[in-house]
């Protein structure tokens, strides 16, 4: 089981995922009624669209941090070294697609962040929020690395 520690999910909803792991290799949540900032929603849409177009990952919410994996899937993974946490989820779904692992998705409730802060955002100029340029650079770099692994 994988989830974040920022309390944006109700851990009791794992009961929605557990019965499905008997039939699927990966059970992935997708956020309903997202409680994220507009910039984060926009970034997520771009990210999911890019992974769908570039790698055929047809998952509603790749980075939803509420997932259940069969041990066999992760044991077979050959993760790229030093991949950022944001792209590792895509790498898992790309691997699953290539190796014909089964995936299903379950809607899970999403709550405002109660701890920590998103590294993908920087705030300045009177409270305006912008995308952290380092995050964009790492995303592009890691996407190219995954593309090389997949296509070359």
PLM feature segments, named:
Residues 81-152:
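Hydrophobic helical membrane-anchoring modules
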Residues 1, 8-86, 113-130, 134:
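Acceptor/aglycone-binding surface of glycosyltransferases and processive sugar-polymer synthases
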